[in-house]
Amino acid sequence: MKVYSLKRILAFGLAALMLLAVAGCGKSENSSGPNSGGKDASSSGQQGNADVLAKYIDENGKIDTSKLTPYKAAEVATVNGRNIIKHNGKPYLYNALHFRYRGLESGLAAPIAKKMFEEGMQKIKESGVDTVILYIYWEDMYDGKTYNFDNLKYQYDVAIKNDLKIQINWFGYDNCGYGGFRKWQKLRSKYPALQVDDPDITEEVPDLSQQIFVDEEIEAIQQLCAFINIYDKDRRTVAIQLENEPDMGEGGMGNWLSQFSVMVDLLNKLGEAVHNSSYSMITKINLTMSGWDEVWEGLDYPARVNKVIEQPHLDLVGPDLYDTNTTQDISFYNKGTNIPAHLELGPSVWSAIGQGVYHLINGYGMGWYDLIDIGFSGHHGLYRLNPDKYEERDGTQILGTPYKGEIEGSTKEFIAMSNSVGALKELLASVPTSDMAGFNIKMKNVASDTKKLGDKKITYDYSNPSAKYGASGLVLKGPDGAYYCFSSQAADFTFPSAPSSVTYGSYNDGAWSEAGKAAANGAKITLEPGKAYRVVL
C-alpha cells in the first residue's frame, strides 16, 4: 500500500521518545449496551438471497434507512480494569488480517482475481485468524448518481462462506495522501478547492470545511451501514476504519496537515454517523509517523495524535508502522477509553511473533497487513503470491524495499501461534493485563526468561543456537485460577511446583474444552506449537 523511507523508520524511535513524554488525554465513551436479538457472529453460511436489498432501495439504488431497525454490534467497554471491544455482547480480540480484493483486481484478470480472492479467504480461515479486513472504496458503491452494492455483496458472501468476522477499511477523501475529489465532484463552484500555498501539495485538495463534502461522505457511510444492517444477518461486522492514513502526504494531497482540524472534525462526524446509523460499530483511525517533526496549527505530533484520541466518536486510534524488526512500543496511545491497536502489522517478518505476544499481554489489537502483498512483490504478506498461487514463507530473506534483506518469518509458525491465540481469544480479550506475561519477546535463539505472575515465578526456556531467530511464549492466569499458555515453537515452561493437571484444548463461553492430556516432567512442561494449554498447580 505504501513504501516507507529509511528516514521514517529511524524517525519512529525518536518520535516514540517524544510520545511517551506527553500526558494522556481522556475520551468520552459511547454509551449504552449492545442490542439484543442478533445472531452470534460465529454462525456460518452465505446469505443465499441476492435480492435481499430489493425491498429497501429506490430507483437510484439508495437504501431507505427508515425501514431498518438499528442495531449496535460493537462498542468499547471497561472489563477487569481494561478497555475492551464487546461484539454482540461478548469480549472481542482484535486479531484481523487485511485482504484487498481491489489489489487482486488491479493485477490479475477478473476470473483469476476472483479465484485468488476466494482461495485467500480460505487461507485466512485456515490461518487461525478469525477476522478479515475488507477494503471498501466509495466509488465502488457510488458513481455520483446511483448506489450499487454488488462489490460489497461479493466480498461479504466470500467472507461469510468462510465464517469470518469482518472489519471494514473505508476509503473516502483520504487514502495514504491520495484520494481527494471524487470523480463526480468536478464543478468547483459546487465543490470548492482549498486555497493553499504549500509546494508539497501538488494536487487539488477539496476544502473539507464546506458542508457539501461532509454531507456526501456521511450519506455514503450511512448507506454502507444500512447495507451491513440488511446483508450481514449474523451481525459479524465489528468495526470500520474511517479513511486510510489521513496523515500520510504520499499522494501530494496534504489533506491532514493543510487542514488538520477540519480533517479531524470530518473524521469525528463520520464516526458519529456510524454510531447513530442503522448498524453501529467500532470506529477506528490509523496514523503514520508523517509530519512527526512538524508543528501545524500550533500542535506538534503528540498533541495532534492526542486531539484525534480525544474525539468522542473515534473509538480506536493507533499506528501502522510495520517494516521494522524491533518490537514497537505503542503505549502512548493507551489513554482514556482508547484501545491501542497496531493497525497494519506485517506478518512477513520474523519479529511478528514477538510483536504479537507484546500486543496480547498489553491488551492491544493486531491488524496483520496482509494476507499477500498487493504489489505482487512479495514483501508484506503472510503468503507470497507468485503470481497466481499462494506460497508459504519459509524463513529466507525479504529482498525488496522497504525490508532491505530482513529475514522473513515462517507462515507455518504464524499459523501455529494464531491457532493457539484463537483457542484462548476469549481470555486474551478480557483478563486483566496484570494477569498476563510474555516471554522472549525479542525472540533470541537461546533464552531463559523468568517472569512473575502474582506470587508465582514462571520460566520459559528455548534453545536453538543454529536458528535465525527464536520463539516467544505467553502465560495468563484465568478466572478459575488455572494458568493458560502457548509457545510459537516447541519450548519449556517451568512452574513453581509440579502441576496436578496439564491439558490442551480451547476456552469458550467461560469454560475449558479439553482435547487431550499432556505430561509434565516435575514442574516443567514442554509445549508444542499450535496448541493452547491449561495448567492447574
Write out the residue ranges for each language-model feature:
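Aromatic-lined substrate-binding rim segments of carbohydrate-active enzymes
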Residues: 114-189, 260-281
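The substrate-binding groove and active-site-proximal loops of carbohydrate-active enzymes
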Residues: 96-112, 135-150, 197-219, 246, ...
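N-terminal carbohydrate-binding accessory modules
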Residues: 45-129
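Aromatic-lined carbohydrate-recognition surfaces of secreted/lumenal glycan-active proteins
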Residues: 169-171, 232-245, 260-303, 318-322, ...
